[in-house]
Amino acid sequence: TLVRARTDLVVGGGCERGADAELLVRVVQEQLAAAGLHPSRIAGIASVTLKQDEPALAALCDALGGVPLRFFEADALAAIATPNPSQVVRAEIGTPSVSEAAALLGAGQGATLVLEKQKFGIGTVAVAQAPHPLRAFTAGQARGQVQLVGLGPGREDWRLAGTDAVLRGADHLVGYTYYTDQ
């Protein structure tokens, strides 16, 4: 059986620091099933930038087929009207909503919540539907990447193939100044 699904859903998530990844994955999968939302429709996961280093969110992306994980600043999330704001979250991180606001902001203008915030022991989850398929989920910020490249013994023509492209695309360089100043 061939199932073709629109990728028009964004899962917004918030969780405690060091949350149990297996529990987060299980709860999100259960919430999607209960709402009748097929996981293949998920274009990506969105959260607040404070969670960029949260392993449970990365595990959730992997469990949902390797969907992208994107982040929004707390002030951007605070500007989004949501049906279930939390004063506790506002006091902690500066926005009254993480899961609902991140889902809506990630799904783009005209998005609607198809699953309002669901609270569970270690966090919250919400799902927004975009008004159109999200062919590439590029809203917000991606997690940073670290790339290790060899600069060789110094001469430009001795560098490994692709090294210059990585260096040109880098926001920050860390290395021995004799090489990085070239």
Regions found by a protein language model. Name each.
Residues 5-9, 42, 108-111, 121-122, ...:
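Short coil/turn connectors at secondary-structure junctions
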Residues 69-73, 112-117, 175-176:
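General beta-strand structural signal in soluble alpha/beta enzymes
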Residues 1-4, 100-135:
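C-terminal edge-of-domain segments
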Residues 1-51, 128-129, 175-180:
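Conserved mixed alpha/beta catalytic, RNA-binding, or beta-rich assembly cores of soluble enzyme
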Residues 12-14, 114-117, 128, 148-150:
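Short beta-strand segments
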Residues 75-80, 121, 180-182:
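Short gly/pro/ser/thr-enriched loop/turn and capping motifs at secondary-structure boundaries
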Residues 48-50, 57-98:
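Long, charge-dense
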Residues 34-37, 139-182:
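Glycine-rich, flexible N-terminal cofactor/catalytic loop recognition
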